Amino acid sequence: MAHVVIGTAGHIDHGKTALVKALTGTDTDQLAEEQARGMTIDLGFAFLNDNVTIIDVPGHEKFIRNMVAGVSTIHMAMLVVAADDGIMPQTREHLQILKLLNIPQCVVAVSKTDLAEDEEWLDLVELDIREITDGIFKSVDVIRTSVNTGVGIAELKNLLEQKAVTVDQSTNRGFFRLQVDRVFSMAGFGTVTTGTVISGDLKKGSTVDVLPGNIKAKVRGIQSHGLDVQSVQLGDRAAVNLSGVDKDKVFRGSELALPGKLKSIKKFTAHIKLASEMKKELKHHQRVRVHLGTAEVLARVHLSGKKKLLSGSTANVNLDLEKSTVAASGDRFVLRTYSPMTTIGGGTVLTTFIPKGVKVNSWVSALDVDPVQRFEQLVDSFSTQPYTISEWALLNQCTDEKVNKWITKLDLQTTKKDIVFTHKILDESKKIIVSTLNIFHQRKPLRRSMGVDILQQESRLSTIWLEEVVAMMKKEGIVKFVESGIALTAYKVKLVGGTAELSRKMENNLTKVGLKPLTTAELSQKYNENDKRVLEVLHVLKGDKKVSEIENGIWMHTENIAKLRQTLIKHFSQNNEMEVTDFKNITALTRKFAIPMLEYCDKQGWTCRSGNQRSKGANL
């Protein structure tokens, strides 16, 4: 069976620590102050058997933060209620916290039964317990115990072990996560962190991210149940010896994770439910305490379009944190007021990011609590910047396999490059591209195509998504590739009026000059036109394959280029080599044009350069 962690719960002085000692033989009050005061202040740990750990939490209201840190990583609870006291304030608050954290199973131990008045009193206490736990857990077993007489101890231990076998640990995300609840240093070893593995597994020698802080650390050693082990897995309690990180950089609330899977955050979107017992409403921008995993972080609550929330209500909210922490979608947390500290509710992390360009209030309010439906909403929110399967896995803090399951369930689409999209996203992207090209063709009627970079900037589609959509549109005959750019298939350049006349004159001139190319500036000067208009006409002629650009700003008619090729053929039929001087002689060109023309011939494969000599090229 997978390792199971049980957490205690209950009012101060109801005998939680004594009961743990009776079950395990371990006194979990290790601090001198705890032993002196006779009360649990911080978390204590004991082993019920090789597969079950018990975390003993403090019962005093002043140490609720420690209690929440302890139970945030447990799989089931052991609620302790003293027979002589019955239900007390911290009994109720601890139960409320267990409910908010969605702890599925609970065993109740009625302690100190030797102090009860009689059996009838015990029956009343048990009745109160069943009433207060009704609706929180699927079922509750109540065992009457006494550490003084030994009554019920063996029965309680057997029940805990039986229940542990049935614990559902299907929350595994597929990658390693450990929420740190203790940090200390050992001479000769360095920094040691302890916590419960809440996802994945970890091997000795691995590298982990220490968050927040984004520190890389090496796993020097691992212990579980006091023994050196090579690895730990989901559910295990572990002490992890780290190298590469100082003790003061890690604290309760830190998290160890597989590198690259989690990020430090300072805000997240969540679905919260306020406790029905809450006496005051929760106000917009109110300062609260967020107990997330083993961390406690102060935050401001941003209600979406509301000024306040009443007790018992639910809502999607944004939480702006005052310091960085770690969270993943699906993580549960507890909300407490800043001062005085009382538990007011809890919630579930929906997402740790908000898409750019959305109306935050309406977007947050509409987010679905169900992770599958929420994934579809998120995919639709990134209509111009669709993500790949791996990117979605990172954003949702899960595996590629989980994302693929969602894709199949929702009947979403993927490209060959694993980009996830819907038919709606594809249709919208196509419309954006068509509209962008239409506007370009209207603004630049003499341009045969729009540069891909410009199309990406104007459409605001991500580069990889634009490539995919354009490829689909080309297959469908909507767009075409022209001159290393993109155009609508139906678009054709039409020269009219003065532009048509300018084109005719320029073409005639480029034909008449023979092997001498002309520059853009020369043509502009000759026809008293600006360079921009001349270039537009030249690109039209180039698209019609009437002229070619030999080099930047140097143009030649294709008929004359063909004549140049014949001139080279004739030269090499009589000579094996050619120097620059030879080329100048056979073309009557100055060095200004001879060099770029020779380089053009090299690119065409008509000539092959070796030092200052050129020989016949493979394409001549």
State the predicted function of each range.
Residues 123, 131-278:
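Conserved catalytic-core segments of large NTP-driven translation/proteostasis enzymes
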Residues 13, 19, 38, 56, ...:
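Residue-level signature of catalytic and energy-coupling elements of molecular machines
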Residues 1-57:
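Conserved G1/Walker A P-loop phosphate-binding module
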Residues 8, 105, 116-121, 131, ...:
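C-terminal effector modules of nucleic-acid-centric enzymes and ribosome-associated factors
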Residues 60-61, 84-88, 103, 112-117, ...:
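Conserved nucleotide-binding/hydrolysis micro-motifs of P-loop NTPases
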